[in-house]
Amino acid sequence: MAIIKPFKGIRPPKELVEKVESRPYDVLDSEEARAEAGDNVQSLYHIIKPEIDFPVGTSEYDPRVYEKAAENFQKFQDNGWLVQDSREHYYIYAQTMQGKTQYGLVVCAHTDDYMKGNIKKHELTRRDKEEDRMKHVRVNNANIEPVFFAYPDNAILNELIMRYAATEPEYDFIAPIDGFRHQFWIIDDDNDMQTITNEFSKMPSLYIADGHHRSAAAALVGAEKQKQNPNHRGDEEYNYFMAVCFQASQLTILDYNRVVKDLNGLSSEEFLAALKKNFEVADKGTDIYKPQQLHEFSLYLDEHWYSLKAKEGTYDNTDPIGVLDVDISSRLILDEILNIGDLRSSKRIDFVGGLRGLGELKRRVDNGEMRAALALYPVTMQQIMDIADSGKIMPPKATWFEPKLRSGLVIHKLS
């Protein structure tokens, strides 16, 4: 069962939300955050990217930077830019991208569920990134930004959400940069909140879509606080962390594509010939060609697009990892032909995800920066859940969720 609870959110007044809200901390660097914040002293970047309050070049891992985050978080509350709700709520957060809307429930999940594996992950985490997020949680005594969860489709929850979605939202704005619509409702009916809690309790698992390091950090800080509290009961706020939970079928996963700097000493003709061992190769001409189905890839090379269809027997339909296109392309193209083994460390490969599209692949090859590009069909949410259920880990650079959650709509304090 998934243990969740409502919480007293800390959030901006309606008239300030567009001043406060921001992109998440991990999708932009310090200079981008500095530019986006500009002279806006109410921007959440002063809390989630507080190095912008120091001279250019200051490390985001400088101890003073973490202290500044806490100082700014307190200032935002003192100035009324962030205000805590007087009672516990669940919230609804909707995102609309290109005419499609996905509705998330903002809840507090239990750290024990993470530790026990009831909150399932599909990515490896790095200790240095965990420690960075742990420092941020510790110093602020809060989850400033939520984790992004998926849950199996649920008709009762969907009906409840749509009932609220037909009412006036608390927040409703078009975000800069992404241009997507973001809406936010407060669930204040006790019966509705009990329904949400009950329906989640029937779910065997929740799935981390995005935010593996934030999840790990929240659980580890919760465990620390348990040890530090001789009167620990188990219902304290530090046992919970903030998540936005979406129905799996509503989520949009975009293609996460590859560009390579060289062909491992092969000519174009030799490379295409090598591909024919495991793929049906078809020249699609000079117009951009997007993969149409699983196990089909698009190759851009020498101003031409090619379709590559993996031959029968090159993958195992019973293996949740081996059947993934990211694994097929890594094994049979990047590793076997191009000798690019470790995608995380190789300098010969880069990744292009999200909304930049295949035009960005073409641009980076045409300008000579890269030698060839490989476009993949997107991973499905069902594939991610199958892998998480099997206890396995997705290959690196496999998933790109869009839209990203905006930060600053609501914050969860740990005490």
Model-derived segments and spans:
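Surface-exposed, charge/polar-rich loops and edge strands
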Residues: 1-415
